[in-house]
């Protein structure tokens, strides 16, 4: 079975923004939930989310005036 890459986001307190805290590979969503909770348990997270990396899509235009340029 092919593993799926999931990005992991969490927030420490209600109302705070979600923060990307890492990523993991798992065979399915249920195992990804278990892996995320046990891998990133060093904090007392209020909320943690997983997102399959294949479901993250760029919003900004790739042909815009600053495409391909870093900050600064």
Feature map (PLM): residue ranges:
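Short, charged/polar surface micro-motifs in flexible loops or helix N-caps
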Residues: 14, 29-31, 56-57
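Short aromatic-glycine-(Arg/Gly/Cys) micro-motifs in beta-strand/loop hairpins
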Residues: 1-19
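A short, charged, amphipathic alpha-helix used as a generic interaction element across diverse proteins
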Residues: 27-44
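A short, exposed loop/beta-hairpin motif centered on an aromatic-Gly-Thr core
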Residues: 18-27
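Short, mixed-charge low-complexity intrinsically disordered segments
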Residues: 40-72
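Conserved short hydrophobic patches within well-ordered secondary structure
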Residues: 9, 25-26, 49-50
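Short acidic, gly/pro-rich beta-turn/loop elements at beta-sheet edges
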Residues: 18, 34, 58-60
């Amino acid at each position: 079975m092919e593993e799926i890459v999931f990005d992991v986001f969490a927030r420490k307190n209600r109302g705070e923004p979600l923060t990307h805290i890492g990523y993991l590979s798992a065979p399915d969503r249920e195992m990804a939930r278990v892996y995320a909770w046990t891998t990133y348990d060093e904090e007392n997270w209020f909320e943690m989310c997983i997102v399959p990396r294949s479901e993250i899509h760029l919003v900004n235009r790739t042909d815009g005036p600053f495409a391909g340029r870093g900050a600064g």
